Design a protein with these regions (language model features):
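Acidic/polar alpha-helix N-cap and adjacent early helical turns
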Residues: 19-23, 515-519, 524-567
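Conserved AMP-binding/adenylate-forming core of the ANL superfamily
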Residues: 28-29, 38, 46-92, 96-100, ...
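Conserved pre-ATP/AMP-binding loop-to-beta segment of ANL
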Residues: 45-46, 160, 173-192, 198-199, ...
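Conserved AMP-binding A3 loop
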Residues: 57-61, 181, 188-215
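Conserved AMP-binding/adenylation subdomain of ANL enzymes
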Residues: 103, 211-228, 238-276, 287, ...
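AMP-binding/adenylate-forming catalytic core of the ANL superfamily
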Residues: 115, 278, 388, 393-394, ...
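Gly/Ser/Thr-rich phosphate-binding loop
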Residues: 275-280, 289-353, 365-367, 372
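Conserved ATP/PPi-binding loop(s) of AMP-dependent carboxylate-activating enzymes
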Residues: 360-363, 374-405, 424, 442, ...
Length: 642
């Protein structure tokens, strides 16, 4: 039993004999990004292309002018077509413009600015970057990494006519690559995607790949020049770059480039910018929904035409809650870097949207394959595979991965799933061991290696644990060497000094031995269940007013009735967004600002209270003294109200 889809949003016909291959053959009209930008400048001229708080809008004409001006500058600095340029810039409009301008004449490789020095060193070396672009005067650890590798640094200098206009400053070098504007089969973008080993894979995407995806997304969402996307996604990931920026521009529309996500800012953004849509990962949607439920959102409903979700599974209750709160359809989709983002998507109303499904094929051909590579019929479980104009031609410098991932023209995603009788795709599991932390794919072995570097650790196994908002969070089981001394707090400190905070395990448990499978191999999948008892923390009541204040604040933010002094904030359901809320409320109560890293280094009420006691100002000490004079019942009531 199977179905054959006809294009984007086409009808499906039943076939009881044929295997299921959802098909789409629509290609991009532009050969490369420069052609798209130039055509937009001609057609839409002074209409806004990119917007942001505190800056003048950048028009389609200005965006093309910036790209056309940047390419000769890159050539003068020794960078041309095919040269990889690492970009480390803060989130916001300059990052979007720089990506487009660099891709117009070279290969853009945006990197997460939160990386530590060792990571920058790896990525710059793996990329064989021809140059690194940094903001003028930046002290990012990327600069030191580039210096150690001899990679030239190009500084982004704001122009005089607006923060979105800039020029490049660096040392002129001979141009070894081809000069001028990029063409269809040039690589426009390189991103790394984590694998089950500690070495990430490099994914090159051509202009043809990106623009095919732009057209696929535009057709799926029926994007028009009047549409405006509110982008809350980071622009060093495929989701933000392609779905939120390129797809909007491809339709002649506009994108609002926010500088940092905040659920509390979202109603203001809706009211001010009046976007017709936004796309985000489930973690962000959950934070937005929680904030929307806390205040009336009805006056803001009219601007949104739909809401889009991708990069991780969206829980059906969150989907239903968003639709109720905002009064528009939520469109869940399925994407990955190797596909230049979109592979499948639920359609817009009035067509059927199925909670729990990532929808119909929406771009490339999508099939379910068995282990031998045979295409399976609907209802049969197997590995999701894709092929089409948006799919990368292969990982760079990784023949082993290409040999196992590409087969008979299909790219095997590593995800397990099936099509139902109507051609809707359901993802049931990941065949790989990646931890999907709110859409951020994290390789567990990378964290293993950091923990194994601690002198007293004999074995470390990182694995996924369920998390109510992120979907999955990170935990690690550690076996100490005989006679070695260590504890969770010490190991977390060790990891925090060597990893970005989003890669540090929320729990590190000490065990005598890590459970193994029948063959004696470590099986990461299922470790959370097998170590469930060890992950449980026995309740212990807070013992000081500061601990009670911290515990009460965590209760309020997470909606819990009780929090013990040794309960880990992140294990209870906390994430970086809620961490900011906790610290903001505590700062308001205590009268001083608390740095965000504090809760990552001190994730329990006991540890955080001790940290706050050390940070307190004299007037806070006086307040604490006054609290101590109150009767216990009155003091507890007051603290609960904080």
């Amino acid at each position: 039993m199977g179905f054959v889809g006809e294009g984007l949003g086409g009808r499906s016909e039943r076939s009881d004999e044929q295997p299921l291959v959802m098909t789409n053959s629509r290609l991009s009209d532009w050969p490369a990004l420069p052609a798209m930008l130039e055509q937009n400048a001609s057609h839409f001229g002074a209409r806004a292309a990119l917007l942001s708080d505190g800056d003048e809008p950048l028009s389609h004409q200005q965006l093309w002018d910036q790209a056309a001006m940047t390419v000769p500058s890159l050539n003068r600095l020794g960078v041309g077509r095919g040269d990889r340029v690492a970009i480390v810039l803060p989130q916001g409009p300059n990052l979007a413009v720089t990506f487009l301008a660099v891709a117009a004449g070279a290969t853009a490789a945006p990197l997460n600015p939160a990386y530590v020095g060792k990571e920058f060193l790896f990525y710059l070396e793996d990329l064989q970057a021809r140059a690194l672009i940094l903001p003028k005067g930046s002290d990012s650890p990327a600069r030191a990494a580039a210096d150690s590798l001899g990679t030239p640094v190009i500084e982004l200098v704001p122009g005089k006519n607006g923060a979105e206009r800039f020029h490049l400053s660096g040392v002129a070098r001979p141009l070894e690559a081809r000069a001028g504007l990029a063409e269809a089969d040039d690589v426009a973008l390189v991103l790394h995607t984590s694998g089950t080993t500690s070495r990430p894979k490099m994914v090159p995407l051509t202009h043809r790949n990106l623009l095919a995806s732009v057209r696929h997304i535009g057709a799926t969402l029926q994007l028009q020049p009047t549409d405006r996307c509110l982008n809350v996604m980071p622009l060093f990931h495929i989701h933000g770059l392609v779905a939120c920026v390129l797809a909007s521009l491809g339709a002649g529309g506009s994108t609002v480039c926010t500088r940092a996500f905040g659920a509390e800012k979202f109603p203001g953004w809706l009211g001010h910018w009046k976007p017709s849509w936004y796309s985000a990962v489930p973690t962000m949607h959950q934070a937005i929904l929680a904030h929307a439920r806390a205040r009336p959102i009805q006056p803001l409903r009219s601007s949104l035409r739909f809401i889009r979700s991708s990069s991780a599974a969206l829980p059906p209750p969150v989907m239903a809650g968003l639709e109720e709160a905002f009064g528009v359809a939520v469109i869940e989709s399925y994407g990955m870097t190797e596909a230049a983002h979109q592979m499948a998507s639920n359609p817009l109303p009035p067509r059927t949207r199925k909670p729990g499904s990532v929808g119909l094929a929406a771009g490339p051909d999508v099939a379910i394959l068995d282990e031998a590579g045979k295409t399976l019929a609907s209802g049969r479980m197997g590995e999701v595979a894709i092929r089409g104009p948006n799919v990368t031609r292969g990982y760079a410098n990784n023949p082993e991965a290409n040999a196992t991932t590409f087969s008979d023209g299909w790219f095997r995603t590593g995800d397990q799933g099936y099509f139902d009788g109507e051609g809707y795709l359901f993802i049931t599991d990941r065949l790989k061991e990646l931890i999907n932390r709110g859409g951020e794919k994290i390789a567990p072995r990378e964290i293993d290696e950091v923990l194994l570097a601690y002198p007293g650790v004999r074995q470390a196994v990182t694995f996924a644990v369920p998390h109510p908002s992120l979907g999955e969070n990170i935990a690690a089981a550690v076996v100490l060497k005989d006679g070695a001394v260590g504890c969770e707090a010490v190991l977390r400190e060790f990891a925090l000094d060597r990893l970005p905070t989003f890669k540090v395990p929320s729990r590190i448990i000490l065990v005598k031995d890590v459970p193994k499978g029948p063959t004696g191999k470590i099986q990461r999948i299922g470790l959370a269940d097998r170590l469930a008892a060890a992950l449980v923390v026995a309740y212990e009541a807070p013992t000081s007013d500061m601990e009670r204040l911290v515990a009460a604040t965590i209760c309020q933010v997470l909606g819990r009735e009780v929090v013990g002094r040794n309960d880990n904030f992140f294990s209870l359901g906390g994430d970086s967004l809620r961490a900011t809320q906790v610290l903001t409320r505590l700062g308001q109560s205590l009268g001083f600002q608390i740095p965000v890293p504090a809760i990552f280094r001190c994730p329990t009420p006991a540890l955080l209270a001790n940290k706050l006691d050390l940070m307190r100002e004299p007037e806070v000490d006086a307040l604490a003294a006054e609290l101590e004079k109150l009767p216990p019942e009155e003091r507890a009531s007051l603290l609960n109200d904080l």
